[in-house]
């Protein structure tokens, strides 16, 4: 039975998403259905946590909107995710960045940037 569950989950895991970690600043394009119309809604913020694995993996994205902190928990295998773009890689020593909730203003989104090395030819 356990092998059957793993087989079904393996077929539903999305492979088109980038490698993301807590501290990264991302821009999500989410499908929103209003009545019979469907549109894309952008949500840009810092990933403060990720949880789970496989089809049950979720991320929590936090942004400051008009001085108010807004968090969204997004399942990564959701068909409502159109795309995820990594705007900035963050350097953190924690898996959960809940300390960002206490900060206000620009400091609420401030995470050191991680240097990404690319091999030279």
From Swiss-Prot:
Origin superkingdom: Bacteria
Gene3D superfamilies in the record: 2.30.30.790
Pfam families the UniProt entry points to: Ribosomal_L19
A molecular function GO annotation: structural constituent of ribosome
Record key words, sorted: Ribonucleoprotein, Ribosomal protein
Entry-linked InterPro entries: Ribosomal_bL19 (IPR001857), Ribosomal_bL19_CS (IPR018257), Ribosomal_bL19_sf (IPR038657), Translation_prot_SH3-like_sf (IPR008991)
SUPFAM superfamilies on file: Translation proteins SH3-like domain
Annotated Gene Ontology cellular component terms: cytosolic large ribosomal subunit
Protein species of origin: Chlorobium phaeobacteroides (strain BS1)
Name by which UniProt lists this protein: Large ribosomal subunit protein bL19
Membership in a protein family: Belongs to the bacterial ribosomal protein bL19 family.
Name of the encoding gene: rplS
GO biological process, one term: translation
Reported function: This protein is located at the 30S-50S ribosomal subunit interface and may play a role in the structure and function of the aminoacyl-tRNA binding site.
